[in-house]
Amino acid sequence: MAEAARVLVLGATGTIGRATVAALCARGHEVVCYLRPGAEAAGLPKGITLRRGEIADIARAGFRGARFEALVSCMASRSGLPADARAVDHDAHVVALGAAQAAGVEHMVLLSAICVQKPMLAFQAAKLAFEARLIASGLRYSIVRPTAYFKSLSGQIARVEAGKPFLVFGDGQLTACKPISDRDLGDYLAGCLDDPWRWNRVLPIGGPGPAITPRDQAEWLFQRLGRPVKLRQVPVGMMDAIIAGLSLGGR
């Protein structure tokens, strides 16, 4: 799909969605964003088309009987709890997929997550179930599974600035990731329409540079603040308890 395409975007008001819309526009695609009623559209690029409605009405209010070449979804559940995850990460996408097929869409680009490789939580299982549905649909697909976002690594900045220790599980070196920026990920998602190598593939992706651990993050943050590193080690067993609690929540 090297030529300009007409693209419907879901989840356009999130940080990754906004970056993806900008990247699609920069590549010359005609972008239509389907937003929830009342969703804040400020900051989206000029020249796009905004349409609003519930996901159940996407065929009528989103596609409107017109032909689209592609559907790009950055839509995700907010809480990740079982009911929310099933409704958004799976069911809403199933509705959107059916409407896309009826609208003649040739290609769906789906923002998923690297953590579905080892599903332990409801939202991971819901995402994985829809991935399987998309793969079996016969539609050309690109399923993008990014590692951590830079923004997700910034959650402890405020507490460290307030003089509190950086929290790590175990010794802070149990996990490592290659975080990716919103702009890089948005550009990668948009590029899936043009790059045949990314078609009909599940695409794990991380940012540039080496993988970093939570301890690496802490050391970098304290260095930037000109302070000695101060960690608080949380027992790994607490992680299991948190996962169990999240899995049970909403049932």
Where are these regions (language model features)?
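N-terminal Rossmann NAD(P)H-binding glycine-rich loop of SDR-like oxidoreductase domains
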Residues: 4-29
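A conserved pocket-lining segment of Rossmann-fold NAD(P)-dependent short-chain dehydrogenase/reductase
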Residues: 159-180, 188-192, 196-200, 204
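Conserved beta-loop-beta element that borders a ligand/cofactor-binding pocket
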Residues: 112, 118, 129-158
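Short-chain dehydrogenase/reductase
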Residues: 86-90, 120-128, 135, 175-183, ...
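Conserved glycine-rich Rossmann-like NAD(P)H-binding loop of the short-chain dehydrogenase/reductase
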Residues: 30-36
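NAD(P)H-binding glycine-rich loop region in Rossmannoid oxidoreductase-like domains
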Residues: 39-103, 115-117
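Mid/C-terminal beta-alpha module of Rossmann-like enzyme folds, strongest
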Residues: 6, 13-15, 188-251
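SDR active-site strand-loop-helix element
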Residues: 10, 34, 74-75, 108-113, ...
